[in-house]
């Protein structure tokens, strides 16, 4: 039986991965959270991978606190760069493939159209810079690596924009939401499904072109538009009785420690052509909004 190792299994994406793989039942799955596998601990990484000898490693472990990373630079780089290095070095010993999750924040957002995998990266913040360096290192070290860039992740688990909006709606009459940043909201369950589909192709020996791929939800919208859609669905499904007045504001109106790209829209042509994978439908995923409110 093929063996899959999931890192970061306690996080938003990791929990989605673990659930899908347990339901799948076709693989021997080792899903480890931070307490069980700290990817910044080289000895721990090598010990677990040497013992389990996974066919595929899905790395869902990451430092994702975008603003906090500006204050904790070394912590962000430790997880997003050094941790990735240790995984790659251990994987090489067993010819394990690595599927690694990255971010739209490797781009500066100045492009007018959607970003392709071949576009030059230019991150604006520490988080984006650390993820970009992790990408570079992984591609350098591991010939059997796939990097999946995604954006604006939401789902049942962890902290995300949908959960934040539903929480704020309970005690706010008015909300200001940024309208001059656009991107593709992406359901974490769909990201997990895509990673598993790719892992399965590797396991059965299909010819897979390793490298960078983009996968997000469509259509691209602003945070403001996404918030409106969330509240519309919440009211329709009686998750909320009343919703706040939502005002469109600019990035300048809502200063943050980390600078974010104005355009996070990613081109999905490559993954569609290579794997037949279609975009995530975030509007469909919002139909499950009751689960995000719990």
Swiss-Prot record:
InterPro entries: dTDP_dehydrorham_reduct, NAD(P)-bd_dom_sf, RmlD-like-bd. The active site is at residue 127. It holds the Pfam family RmlD_sub_bind. NADPH binds at residues 12-13, 38-39, 62-64, 127, 131. It catalyses: dTDP-beta-L-rhamnose + NADP(+) = dTDP-4-dehydro-beta-L-rhamnose + NADPH + H(+). Binds 1 Mg(2+) ion per monomer. GO terms for molecular function: dTDP-4-dehydrorhamnose reductase activity; metal ion binding. One of its GO terms (cellular component) is cytosol. One of its GO terms (biological process) is O antigen biosynthetic process. DTDP-beta-L-rhamnose binds at residues 103-104, 152. Signal peptide: none annotated. Keywords: Carbohydrate metabolism, Lipopolysaccharide biosynthesis, Magnesium, Metal-binding, NAD, NADP, Oxidoreductase. Its cofactor is Mg(2+). Pathway: Carbohydrate biosynthesis; dTDP-L-rhamnose biosynthesis; Bacterial outer membrane biogenesis; LPS O-antigen biosynthesis. The record marks 103 as: Could provide a fine-tuning to achieve optimal pKa matching between active site and substrate. Homodimer. This is dTDP-4-dehydrorhamnose reductase. The lineage of its organism: Bacteria, Pseudomonadati, Pseudomonadota, Gammaproteobacteria, Pasteurellales.
């Amino acid at each position: 039986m093929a063996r899959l190792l999931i890192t970061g299994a306690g996080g938003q994406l990791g929990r989605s991965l673990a659930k899908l793989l347990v339901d799948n039942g076709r693989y021997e799955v080792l899903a480890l959270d931070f307490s069980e596998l700290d990817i910044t601990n080289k000895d721990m990484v090598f010990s677990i991978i040497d013992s389990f000898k996974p066919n595929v490693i899905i790395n869902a472990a990451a430092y994702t606190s975008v603003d906090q990373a500006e204050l904790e630079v070394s912590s962000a780089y430790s997880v997003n760069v050094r941790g990735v290095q240790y995984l790659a070095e251990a994987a090489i010993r067993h010819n394990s493939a690595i599927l690694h999750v990255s971010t739209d924040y490797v781009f500066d957002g100045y492009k007018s159209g959607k970003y392709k995998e071949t576009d030059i990266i230019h991150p604006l913040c520490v988080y984006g810079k650390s993820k970009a360096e992790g990408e570079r290192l992984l591609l350098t070290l591991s010939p059997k690596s796939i990097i999946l860039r995604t954006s604006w992740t939401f789902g049942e688990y962890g902290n995300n924009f949908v959960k934040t909006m539903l929480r704020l709606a309970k005690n706010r009459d008015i909300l200001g939401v940024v309208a001059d940043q656009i991107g593709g909201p992406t359901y974490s369950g769909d990201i997990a499904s895509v990673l598993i589909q790719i892992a399965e192709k590797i396991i059965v020996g299909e010819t897979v072109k390793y490298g960078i791929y983009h996968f997000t939800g469509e259509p691209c919208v602003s945070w403001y538009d996404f918030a409106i859609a969330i509240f519309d669905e919440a009211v329709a499904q009686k998750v909320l009785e009343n919703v706040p007045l939502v005002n469109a504001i600019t990035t300048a109106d809502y200063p943050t420690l980390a600078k974010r790209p104005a355009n996070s829209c990613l081109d999905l042509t490559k993954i569609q052509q290579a794997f037949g994978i279609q975009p995530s439908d975030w509007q469909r995923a919002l139909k499950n909004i009751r689960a995000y409110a719990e």
